[in-house]
């Protein structure tokens, strides 16, 4: 069991079929990362991800007191030009009330462990957030292009077995 910064129990779990928090999770992923009218995209993607709990894509939530306080997803591709790289970490989110308590770092570490369980040696992400991922051992390895043609930095980290940052 992990604990939040206020000492209350916190758990990180993969969304599974019939999860009672599924609807709330869809809403949070969509409202945080989606576009207006795009809820069906997230619901469909997340529903179909539930067919193989050991594969990708997979969606995860951090829960405290029955409230979703963080999210991330492991995806085959994060809608960018680098189709040769996989898997991708996407949708990393920490509730503003939980920021500063290392939940983001815990979710990043959890993602690396889950990536290794799926047989991958590394994980990728795109972000224009400078300095955040680097402090957790992620390396900038270049750029990808999104569907609008804009460049966005690519970050890479190894799973724990392959030498991921253990801090």
What is each residue range found by the language model?
Residues 1-24, 161-167:
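Conserved N-terminal entry element of GNAT/NAT acetyltransferase domains
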Residues 19, 26-40:
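Helix-loop element at the rim of GNAT/NAT acetyltransferase active sites that forms part
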Residues 34-63, 69:
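Active-site rim helix/loop that mediates acceptor-substrate recognition in acyltransferases
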Residues 61, 67-77, 88, 93:
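Conserved beta-strand in the GNAT
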Residues 82, 95-106, 118, 135:
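Conserved glycine-rich acetyl-CoA-binding loop
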Residues 91-94, 100-113, 125:
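Conserved acetyl-CoA-binding loop-helix of GNAT-fold acetyltransferases
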Residues 115-127:
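Conserved GNAT acetyl-CoA-binding A-motif
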Residues 124-129, 143-167:
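C-terminal "cap" of GNAT-fold acetyltransferases
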